[in-house]
């Protein structure tokens, strides 16, 4: 990463595993942010299912400024539109361990409305490139509870790439495979030695994508 010139950084969820208190969360965030020049460039932390769990999950809100003050949203970086979704938990709301405290079903429904409004917006339509980011994959994985709600909306969405995580194993699905209407990249493992870095570089109307593993080896270059 030291040789990569980047404008901002995304961490795509499950970085803070089951946060128990402020000290633990702050320590983990410090480890990640120090390695990516967070004092010089914006850093976005997407919420994965593990950030939702444990005693300090609600306290994480104090550590982040979300775009639009929600865990999902969209913004422009130049003429590129970046759309972020929050998949919530990977288990149904009525799972006993949640004690009827979760309502991620409504969160997923809210994002259907958001997606329709976003894709109808001038900012989305005028963008030269469009990037979709969410933690749990919709394609290449059948366990996403958002599938039935989100897939019909995204089937013909003109995204240039979708970035996912959650499975702890790198994968790449070209457009058309897995019935996806855009290319999908799933990031790597659940430890630093198995991690992947996905580098997106846009010059004029061209979007180049490279994936590196923790050893610096190139896994994908398109």
Feature locations, PLM:
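Active-site glycine-centered loops adjacent to acidic/histidine catalytic or metal-binding residues
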Residues: 13-14, 48-49, 135, 165-166
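A short C-terminal boundary segment appended to hydrolase-like catalytic domains
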Residues: 201-222
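Residue-level marker for buried hydrophobic side chains located in beta-strands
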Residues: 9-11, 45, 132, 163
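Histidine-centered catalytic micro-motifs
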Residues: 132-138, 160-170
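Short acidic, glycine-rich surface-loop motifs adjacent to enzyme active sites
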Residues: 11-16, 119-141
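Extended active-site neighborhood of metal-dependent phosphoesterases/phosphodiesterases
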Residues: 23-120, 149-161, 171-190, 194-203
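N-terminal active-site segment of His-dependent metallophosphoesterases
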Residues: 1-22
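Conserved acidic residues
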Residues: 7, 128-130, 160
């Amino acid at each position: 990463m030291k040789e990569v010139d980047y404008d901002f950084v995304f961490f795509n969820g499950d970085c803070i595993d089951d946060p128990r208190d402020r000290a633990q969360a702050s320590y983990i965030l410090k480890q990640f942010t120090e390695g990516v020049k967070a004092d010089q460039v914006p850093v976005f932390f997407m919420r994965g299912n593990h950030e939702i769990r444990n005693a300090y999950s609600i306290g994480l809100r104090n550590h982040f400024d979300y775009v639009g003050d929600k865990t999902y949203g969209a913004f422009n970086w130049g003429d590129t539109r970046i759309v972020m979704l929050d998949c919530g938990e990977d288990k149904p709301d009525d799972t006993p361990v949640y004690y009827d405290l979760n309502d991620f079903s409504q969160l997923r429904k809210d994002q259907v409305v958001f997606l329709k409004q976003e894709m109808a917006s001038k900012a989305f339509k005028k963008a030269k490139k469009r990037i979709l980011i969410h933690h749990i994959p919709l394609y290449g994985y059948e366990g996403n509870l958002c599938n039935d709600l989100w897939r019909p909306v995204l089937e013909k969405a003109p995204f240039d790439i979708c970035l996912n995580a959650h499975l702890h194993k790198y994968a790449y699905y070209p457009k058309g495979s897995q019935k996806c209407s855009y290319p999908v990249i799933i990031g790597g493992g659940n430890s630093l030695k198995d991690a992947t870095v996905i580098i997106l570089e846009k010059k004029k109307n061209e979007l180049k994508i490279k994936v590196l593993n923790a050893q610096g080896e190139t896994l994908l270059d398109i």
